Amino acid sequence: MSGRGKQGGKARAKAKSRSSRAGLQFPVGRVHRLLRKGNYAERVGAGAPVYLAAVLEYLTAEILELAGNAARDNKKTRIIPRHLQLAIRNDEELNKLLGKVTIAQGGVLPNIQAVLLPKKTDSHKAKSK
């Protein structure tokens, strides 16, 4: 026998994605490819795409959590751009991060300046006179 073939060799382990190794939903491999193709640097370390994917996943989860709360407050089961807008603009840190971002179909925050509100008069004094 010449020793060819796979009779005695170890079976190769099932391939495991870098996303699953890191416990992430966002694609680490795709982020790595985009970092390489984007001409951000000549070389990209192995940890950089994992870290960036984790940050993106966290920010997405945070925004979706707040948008889901906004949708529930409006008695809706589907998140629409309006809910994203309300979630981002009502959160101080997200509003600072995404301050220059325009969300299509997002609308504006409801805001009436105090000067424009009707003056509060004492209705009890007016009725007694």
From Swiss-Prot:
Localization, UniProt: Nucleus; Chromosome
N6-succinyllysine found at: K10, K96
Protein modification: Monoubiquitination of Lys-120 (H2AK119Ub) gives a specific tag for epigenetic transcriptional repression. Following DNA double-strand breaks (DSBs), it is ubiquitinated through 'Lys-63' linkage of ubiquitin moieties, leading to the recruitment of repair proteins to sites of DNA damage. H2AK119Ub and ionizing radiation-induced 'Lys-63'-linked ubiquitination are distinct events. Phosphorylation on Ser-2 is enhanced during mitosis. Phosphorylation on Ser-2 directly represses transcription.
Cross-link Glycyl lysine isopeptide (Lys-Gly) (interchain with G-Cter in ubiquitin), where in sequence: K14, K16, K120
Positions of post-translational N6-glutaryllysine modification: K96, K100, K119, K120
Residues that bear N-acetylserine: S2
Transmembrane spans: none
N5-methylglutamine PTM positions: Q105
CDD domains named in the record: HFD_H2A (cd00074)
Modified residues (N6-acetyllysine): K6
Pfam families found in the cross-reference section: Histone (PF00125), Histone_H2A_C (PF16211)
GO molecular function annotation: DNA binding; protein heterodimerization activity; structural constituent of chromatin
Region span, Disordered: 1-22
GO cellular component, one term: nucleosome
Stated role: Core component of nucleosome. Nucleosomes wrap and compact DNA into chromatin, limiting DNA accessibility to the cellular machineries which require DNA as a template. Histones thereby play a central role in transcription regulation, DNA repair, DNA replication and chromosomal stability. DNA accessibility is regulated via a complex set of post-translational modifications of histones, also called histone code, and nucleosome remodeling.
Name listed for the protein in its UniProt record: Histone H2A
Source organism (scientific name): Cairina moschata
Taxonomic classification: Eukaryota, Metazoa, Chordata, Craniata, Vertebrata
